[in-house]
Amino acid sequence: MIRKLTRGSIIAIAAVMLLLPFYKAHAGIPVGTWRAHPAYNDATFSLKAFGMTAVLSDGAIYLYDPSDNGLYTIDKTGGLGDTDIAAMGYCNSEQAVILVYSNGNIDLLYNDFTIYNFTDIKNNGTGSVSVNELKVIADKAYISTNIGLIVFDVKRREISNTYRFDTQVYSSVVFNDTIICSTDSGMYLGLDSDNLLDKNKWKKFSDIRFRTLFEFDGQLAGNSFINRIWTIDRNTAALKEKIKDDVTGLSLQTDGRLVLIQDTAVTFYNSLSDFTAYIFPSHVNDVMTDGDDVWACQGNYGLCRYSITNDGLVLKARMIKPDSPRRNWFHSVSWPQPGRLLAVGGCHNYQNINYPGTVMIYENDRWTSLDEDIPSKTGVNYQNLTEAVQDPSDPDHIFVGSTGQGLYEFRNGKFSKLHTWNNSGLSSILNDTEFNKNNYVRISALQYDKEGNLWMANNETDTILKVMQPDGKWFGLYYSEIAGLPTFKQLRFDDKGRIWINSSRYNPGLVCIDLNGTLKKNSDDKIKFSGPYFVNQDGTTEEISQLTFYDVDMNGEMWIGTNRGLFILKDPDSFIDDANPVFERVKISRNDGSGLADYLLNGVYVTAMYIDQGNRKWIGTLDQGIFLLSADGTSTLEHFTTSNSPLPSDNILSITENGQDGSLFFGTSLGMVEYGGQARDPEESLSESNILVYPNPVKPDFDGYVTITGLTEFSSIRIMSNSGHLVHMGTSNGGSYSWNLTDMNGRQVPSGIYHAIITNQENNKSESTSITVIR
């Protein structure tokens, strides 16, 4: 069972979990609340704490209680101060798990499950902090970073000292009365009794660098950057190679033993001359011993439990990990059918960074991923995926584009075929070598049309638009206006059958193509490309370098996201024939008496967009989190960032909504979170049988929104007291409405029975429902 911890005691979990099934049955998660979806698929480190095993996996933490096989997760929604844990340790004297994040932020998780957040290192004002190592000695945490060695006093919850070396500190160790640091420029030692804040007190005694320093068997030792173990004479700096084989990991156990890991081989040392080795069934990242039990972190196999017997190593349990996404990367997300989220973790490889091929499905509260055992079958790397699309006639048939290897086809979750330059209508950018032919077939912007044809962009080739027909045959459509352009991110059909695509960089712009009713004949087609210069309603010309996203709202207006902010194409129907289309900017009055206004989100790099059932705009940005805008954009209703919400990152990659329950899913560079939104798919007609209110009754300890679902679009809601007074009124967001239990003056309403009168947009039908409030 997975249980989510809060800042309060563990007893509070039962109450929280009792509530969740009620909300789940009706609304996903409550309006205004959050649920994190971190990956727990690469277990790398574990330690014993509070009678449980704490596991670090994909930069997140979970705990396993062997007494009842309970799994406990904790994240930003449950009180952690940050995301992406770089190192974890345990302070026995303070009964605290120490979590050091990749940005230097620190959380102390105590045995009563309270959390103390320490931000001084993160907010040090000297630039970004990256963490290389954490060692806990007594009540001190020694944190090796890119800015030096930081000593954190766990008991006093403060920084004791910061020793700066003007270079990376990879590892540190306290050996007798000396602190020894391995840095990018060699090893330094300093007497603990000296004023080590004075750099001159540190003595450089070797040019050799070590990834990890440690003390064992009365000797100073280190794991070098070529993964060999050496002993180090601290006086002469003489090195003796002790273990030549490739050491991929090591740990010092609480019982004093040293554990060295070499892929699947794990050796337990009582001393450097007294050891026992075991072979594990798969790669091991870390090992923790507890009597005769051995807890191994084995990557995708999660936490595994073994016993040491006279017959050797015996597996007792494996795959001890919470259900979670495969990875923390959500480049593209969509809902191809009700109840199914389809996510792709990849990129367009702008920075020449290769992301493992990742396609994930979230359905029925479970995460699964598509087959990844592909390179052995294709001979090319499976990486940098761009977008996935589900066959509208077969939910088990999925196509996925990639930045270099072509179009992947999956059936029933298993890899079926790679469509590439030599077996399809697709083309490679480079044709000089076999390697280049196989690795420069760039496919993105996948979309099915009503006839079941699969459209896509074959980037940076002469013929950009390629189409695979239902019978597997291919054809291409050539347009000189877009030939050779490198990056198309979206391809969509409007209600008139026109194609809209966006060239996102290097001559970015908006493209509209009218096929004129002839699918394969492009001589009678009309095409319009506009960019990279946009002219706004003031006649001002603005140059964009990125056109990242577009979407059409309920008023038929196209909202366009760029590196300069938002633009609006008021009449998309006239765009293709308009010689000088106007891309309007929303203006926000300064309200300072000057009569001046500023452009909405001017200069803000927009990366993602979603228009919900209330016609509100959810805007994702490169480094400023998420904005929720009113339907016309003139009001900012919410602004979520990492500092005021559980967002794991302010770099937003994707946004989508589960229209059934109104939950928003935000994909970021550090993982996904879900937010209980106020809008959902509307009903076609207003009917008492569809209307549902929850929670109802409202209990005294409830602090949230009452949600009314089953409404038609733009229904009006009037909430009346039992005596007939108007208490509250509003308009539905799609098929739902959320009430914060306040009256027209913003005051909390008292106990009583309230009546919601709901009228459809046409004002020809009304229904009512009751809400009981108990204070």
Predicted segments, located by residue:
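Surface-exposed coil/turn segments at beta-strand junctions on protein surfaces, enriched
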Residues: S393, D449, D494, G710-T712, ...
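A generic structural motif
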Residues: I374, N422, N733-G734, T772
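Carboxylate-rich, polar loop motifs that coordinate divalent cations or form catalytic acidic clusters
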Residues: H26-I691, L726, I757
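Short, glycine-anchored, charge-dense loop/turn motifs used at functional sites
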Residues: S716-V727, G746, Y754
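Glycine-centered coil/turn sites that cap beta-strands in beta-rich domains
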Residues: S685-R718, S736-W739
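Short, surface-exposed loop/turn motifs with a glycine/proline- and acidic-biased composition
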Residues: S732-N763
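Edge beta-strands of extracellular beta-sandwich domains
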Residues: S766-I771
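Bacterial Sec-dependent N-terminal signal peptides
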Residues: M1-G32, W455, W500, R775
